[in-house]
Every structure is written in C-alpha cells, then in structure tokens.
Amino acid sequence: MAKAIDKNNVWYQEVAPRSFYKEEDLERVIIQNLEIIFPHFKALPFKKKLFDSARNKSNTPDLVMIKADYSEWYIIEVELGKHDKKHVLEQIETFYNCSYTDDHASYIFNKRRRGFNLNSLKTLIATQSPKLMVIVNEPKDDWKEDLKSFRCMTCIFQIYQDFEGKALYRLNGEHPYIYTNFCHCKYEKVGYPF
C-alpha cells in the first residue's frame, strides 16, 4: 500500500481500493471535493438518464461539471476499480452518443439555480458536446485505451487517511488542467557538489 507524508510529518496510508467503501461513498467524497480540486468549475450530481438512440440504451451518469466561464463541461462517471470494464464502457458509450438538448441545461439549472445562468448553459450545451471523464479509485491501465475511443479521460482519485482518520486525496491520470499560483516542482540545493 502506498503512503504519503505531509509537510507536518504526518503519515497517511492509502485506503485499500477494494476494502470498505462502496461506489456511493467514493462519489460522495468526490462531489464534496470536486470544486476544491477544480476551482474553475461548478460541480453537482447529475442523475438524469441519458439516451443513446443508436443503440436504444440509456444510462445515468454520476456528476456534471461546468466551467465557470461556460467554455467547457464534463459528464463524469465515478467507478470502483473492481467493476467490469464492459460495464464502464457501455455507460460511456451512451454518454458519448447522447444528443444533449435544452432539457439537459434546464435539469442542471434546476438542480442548482444559484451560480448558473440558464441561457449560458443552453448555449454551452447546444454548441459543445461534453467532455467525458471516468473517475476511478485505482489505476486501470486496461480501461484507458478503450475509454479514449470515446474521447473519455481516466482520472484516478485515491483516498489516504492518517491514524486519526483525517483524509488526504491524490489525483492522477487525465483531468482538466488545474491552475495554481505556485510551481508544481521544488528544487532545493542540498550539499556538495550540488
């Protein structure tokens, strides 16, 4: 199991991906932290069935994420790594083939009126297909190529806990760029000959 240490010398142990939590637990943790992780986006649960008329199938995604400037949006499926790849691909194919309409914009707006402009949502959804992203709790290299055929990102969201139960989250894989006001690398000059 992986471990992490913070700047205060507190150790965190990775929560075993296949251990105690269910998909709903992972989804809840992700939705609680998504706007912190991606501060330029507004996120909310998205439990509206999406229909793929080409295959006559429907599936329901977990989350939606809208960029604050209405320049892009994401349909997100949260998955546990222990789930079958076929199950995941079937859902993503539905989201990929769905025709998004004003009805979807109204659904998002009605779920969280504060912070959204209905006309801007309608314009975004009418002019841009959503980007697709699967957020999974463990690396799934065998999913990545198949998901890419639907232009779907694979984001790994791992949960770590210290000995008091305080959480630390690790994000890896493909995801929207995270704009920060600090450098992601730190180089320290240590000893001779450096």
Residue ranges of model-derived segments:
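Charged, terminal alpha-helix-loop-beta segments
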Residues: 1-194
